């Protein structure tokens, strides 16, 4: 009789963590229009993760690369040679990491 009682808190804990998780778009390679060309999926965040997307452009604004994921994320923009790498984060709503070039 003790085992079912012990399993109840574990089940409730798993249910709560899945309810609190955020769903995000996951794509290994976006094109310049924001469409996923490789690896289109949905991911669910783990603790400390949020929805993220990275866009790489040239200094004159030409699109080079983009991706979407669930990740630990800090929004930054970094210049590396002739490229600008923008890391963006969101957690307000599910699938908030949709890319609109």
Curated annotation (Swiss-Prot):
UniProt PTM: N-glycosylated.
Pfam families: UPAR_LY6 (PF00021)
Compartments where found: Secreted
Glycosylation sites: 67
Membrane spanning residue stretches: none
Keywords associated with the record: Disulfide bond, Glycoprotein, Secreted, Signal
Cysteine-cysteine disulfides: 24-51, 27-36, 43-70, 73-89, 90-96
Any GO CC annotation of this UniProt entry: extracellular region
Signal sequence interval, chain numbering: 1-21
Main location class: secreted
Residues in UPAR/Ly6 domain copies: 22-99
UniProt name for this protein: Urinary protein 1
Organism for this UniProt entry: Rattus norvegicus
């Amino acid at each position: 009789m003790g085992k079912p009682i012990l399993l109840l808190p574990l089940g409730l804990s798993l249910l709560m963590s899945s309810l609190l998780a955020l769903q995000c778009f996951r794509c290994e390679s976006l094109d310049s229009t924001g469409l996923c060309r490789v690896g289109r999926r949905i991911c669910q965040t783990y603790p400390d993760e949020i929805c993220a997307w990275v866009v790489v452009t040239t200094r004159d604004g030409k699109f080079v690369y983009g991706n979407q994921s669930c990740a630990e994320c800090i929004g930054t923009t970094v210049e590396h040679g002739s490229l600008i790498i923008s890391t963006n984060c969101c957690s307000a709503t599910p699938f908030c990491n949709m890319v609109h070039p």
